[in-house]
Amino acid sequence: MMKRSNLWMLATILACGLVMASCLDEQIDKPSTTEPEQTSAKDPGKWWINENNMDKTVNPGDNFFMYCNGSWWKNTTIPQGKNYVDQFTNVKPTFQERIGSLDNPNLQTFLTHLKWADDGSEAAIAGQRLYDDVLAQSGLNEAKTKEDVLRAFGRMAAMGVCPGAWLEPMFIDGKVCLYAKYYLEEEMVEPVIDGLDLAIPDQPSLLQMMQDDPSLQSHLVPLAGRSGTRAVPDDCLPLRYIVEGMGFDPKDVYFLDDYYKKKNVQNESIDYSVKRDKRDYNETFSLALSIEKLKKAVLHYYGLDYGFISQKTRAAYDEQYMKENELSPSETSKVGMKALVAVMALNYTSYMNAKVVADQMVPKSLKEEYLKYCEELRTVFAQRIKANEWMSEGSKKNALEKLEAMVFNVGYPDKWVEEALPDLSKSKSLIEDIYSFRKSRVNLLKAIIGKTRQEASFTVMLMNGLPLSKENAEYFSFYNAITIFPYYLLPPRHDPAQSLAINYAYLYVFGHEMTHGFDTNGSQYDKNGDYREGGIWASEADKAEFDRRAGLLVKWFGSFDVLPDEMPGVKAEGKVTLPENIADLGGIEIAWQAYINRLQADGYTGQELKLMKQRFFLAYANEWCAKYGQKHVDYFSFGKERSEGPDPHSLNKERVNGILPNMDDWYDLFGVKPGDKLYLAPADRIHIW
């Protein structure tokens, strides 16, 4: 995936000091003054790449990154306390600041209500009324059977009460269904008290787990019996009745068997099975309980929200909780405002906030423009696959089918679920806000059940807390979808007024994400996003040739000195960065061919055509204009003091110098010849996609 450098982010002005260049290096050809202008099209956009950033003393064939960015590197100081700076570092306002300035009435209402209501205030009275009404409407008190008690609990959850079952979207046979698991006392009650969570289970989503281990799907069991399926165990039957009460068909809801509990018995931190806490959750909603005890268990969950009504109810709840759990006052605290903001933003408001961003920042015309660009790149990619000389027809067929099925999530979802967009205009209290958020989530789940994986991919991502404010573009192999966030659609990342060369060089990002579907990881998944043994390869020979070419890329990138002056002899990491390097190489080649097609269609010829071609490579190098030192290299490339380990991307210099020498046209355009440090003989140039 691409990487550049939780509520909201945006950069809208060009980096300070960037001006339209009056000329380029002597090696870059100018349009002939004797050639009639009408013989060639002219670039109507602005060429704002600053010539003063270049270092003309550097031979392009020795270090193209420094040839394009060397003077900027020399003249730029890394800010104190930082290890990295690029041309967008000091751009103001930032992406987050721009988004934070949007008109978001629901969010403002919620932020206003985060302060606990005074006892007896209008807000406290409204919150208490809602709290009481939900219980009355649920039918819990009138329930005559245990099953009806649990269905009443489900109805309460559909109205916004803290649920006893957590439902997540997932996919079976390519269609959206739901995964259900119990809320755990230890995961829910204590975090609510100490201000760290709002009843959100502290575990990865099932979709994340399935991407880590595709075999997980074989251990999913439906809550309603189907022909040939295993029977629902007694300890999961309560889930069935709860989801029925919420308005879901149990045939669309699954749970995990005990496989993962057994598999991870030696790793207590990883347990994907239906877990029980120290008070034995199996007994909390067990059908073996009497109706009275089962109602009491439901009321316990209902009571978890009581503390959100006012200061008085908060204190009463804290006192009761401490007494039941034998805690001292120092061991618990009231829910903090910042914690509530963070959790709500990530888990309940992301869909609502995404709609605000879409409406106010990404016009439909912009989304449509980029969808056309994506289709343009898809066409080029398909042509390249068909012309591929090392793949068999069977592998080509699989690759083409996967490319054709690939979904382009650009800017925002194609369709919005209005019932999933809360309206807090009449809300007067925090608990009303929370109930509204939870109800909206249930409505969204109902709306996407039965949709195809590709249809629902963007919505599911937003449900799982992926914000549209993310400064990224990503490929998700599980969905076979690329997602282009608004950051990459707006200035300074994209500007329709700038040169065609800059915009097409920038489209490399999109080609990069497409190519991720065919890198060492993505190629293991089929057109539907399902993991397949053997991946897209129709023969072992095709896979072996792919691996051979990938190995050449590892060796090539591993030949670069990361910082020759500061870290002599230290080479770049080629193996860890391989998937990203494959995507970089494929992305730039796809964007380049699309650009050439555009230049030809627009009528560029002669010296003007050559100049436009050169500008594409200059713009690509400018995309990676940055400065960094040893601390950044140690942290970024080698994972020193970085909890997640080395970054999977190459350093900026290698994303230029490691990629472009594999492109034949680059040599002629910049006079690169044998003996230059970056020169690769034609037979040694690496082409994969």
PLM region descriptions:
Residues 371-507, 516-689:
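Zinc-dependent metallohydrolase catalytic domains
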Residues 17-42:
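Bacterial Sec-dependent N-terminal signal peptides
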Residues 100-377:
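Noncatalytic, helix-rich "gating/capping" subdomain that lines the substrate-entry/channel surface
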Residues 1-10:
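Bacterial N-terminal signal peptides that target proteins for export
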Residues 38-52:
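Short, Gly/Pro- and small/polar-rich lid/capping loops
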Residues 42-43, 59-62, 67-124:
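Active-site-surrounding "flap" and adjacent substrate/cofactor-binding loops of secreted or lumenal enzymes
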Residues 57, 254-292, 296-328, 332, ...:
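Functional cleft and adjacent loop/helix regions within the main domain
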